[in-house]
């Protein structure tokens, strides 16, 4: 099992495929529906030979959501430019899956600081909190919000508030006393978290690398994807965006839904690349929505540790005029 990277460059494709093969081997622990069993001790509790961790708690501005943030700091000395750093949503689930063998792999290259942003719960997900924090406000047409009903019943639309908390309170505390390379600051999210990453790519310049895994684009009838494809490249020259999507999907529409979704994403990525934006599509063949969490977060970490960036010279050239 491997991931296909849709862009030119055989050597880069082979390197990425090798990295994600490893990520997928570690990604066997995944579920079509969230496993809400209480979590046991994680790598921060057990200790690591390659990273040390600190934990901090935060509250939302309205006092309704409560966060726990794990910051994993490599024991390996920082490079002259500073550590890369990856902010990871659904931090409880990430910490439950973060393993010593993976940390060892990261340490063998350029290990990133890992900031796992979770909630003050012993469950892998706080479903109500993440639904609010990770989703942008729905587009309003004719006085009504454009979005799906049914499965999308939890209150959403709080991504702007959460992004403000993440960038203005959580990040300064997480990076305190650590030498960070701001040019290698990334963010990863899965499902609703993937939506947050896309919305942040449009709305914020705090990060440089944006990893959006299986974003729940159907929530707003793909209007967010339309906004992405209409982006002016001059505003986004300094950013890299990675769509990470499995080419299988659970449920009764497994034969039609993935093809439609992937086709729309492929077309969107193609349009963005043609306009000079630094965008890639990473395909995980045969991986369903749930297991994409495991495969994609490991893929993002491994990618960050290589120090690779997308070629954005065309964008840089146009922006300098």
Regions found by a protein language model. Name each.
Residues 30-83:
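A domain-start/cap signature at the N-terminus of enzymes
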Residues 1-10:
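N-terminal secretory signal peptides that target proteins for export/translocation
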Residues 203-239:
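Mobile cap/lid helix-loop segments that gate and shape the active-site cleft of serine hydrolases
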């Amino acid at each position: 099992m491997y991931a296909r990277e849709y862009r030119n460059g055989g050597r880069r494709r082979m390197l990425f495929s090798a990295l994600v093969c490893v990520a997928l081997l570690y990604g066997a622990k995944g579920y079509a529906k969230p496993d809400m069993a209480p979590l046991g001790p994680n790598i921060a509790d057990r200790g690591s030979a390659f990273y040390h961790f600190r934990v901090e708690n935060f509250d939302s501005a309205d006092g309704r959501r409560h966060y726990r943030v794990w910051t994993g700091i490599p024991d390996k000395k920082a490079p002259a430019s500073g550590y890369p750093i990856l902010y990871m949503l659904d931090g409880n689930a990430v910490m439950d899956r973060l393993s010593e063998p993976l940390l060892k792999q990261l340490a063998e290259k350029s290990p990133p600081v890992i900031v796992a942003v979770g909630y003050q719960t012993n469950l892998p997900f706080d479903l109500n909190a993440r639904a609010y924090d990770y989703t942008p406000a729905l587009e309003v047409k004719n006085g009504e919000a454009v979005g799906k009903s049914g499965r999308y019943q939890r209150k959403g639309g709080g991504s702007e508030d959460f992004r403000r908390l993440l960038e203005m309170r959580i990040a300064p505390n997480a990076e305190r006393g650590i030498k960070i390379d701001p040019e290698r600051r990334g963010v990863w999210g899965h499902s609703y978290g993937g939506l947050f990453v896309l919305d942040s790519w449009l709305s914020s310049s705090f990060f440089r690398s944006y990893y959006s895994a299986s974003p729940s684009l159907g929530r707003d009838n793909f209007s967010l994807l339309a906004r992405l494809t209409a982006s002016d490249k001059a505003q986004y020259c300094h950013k890299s965006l990675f769509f990470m999507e499995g080419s299988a999907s659970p449920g009764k529409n497994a034969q039609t839904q993935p093809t439609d979704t992937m086709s729309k994403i492929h077309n969107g990525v193609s349009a963005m690349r043609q306009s000079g934006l630094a965008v890639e599509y990473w395909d995980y063949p045969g991986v369903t929505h749930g297991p994409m969490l495991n495969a994609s977060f490991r893929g993002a970490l491994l990618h960050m540790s290589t120090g690779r960036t997308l070629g954005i010279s065309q964008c840089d050239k146009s922006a300098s005029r």
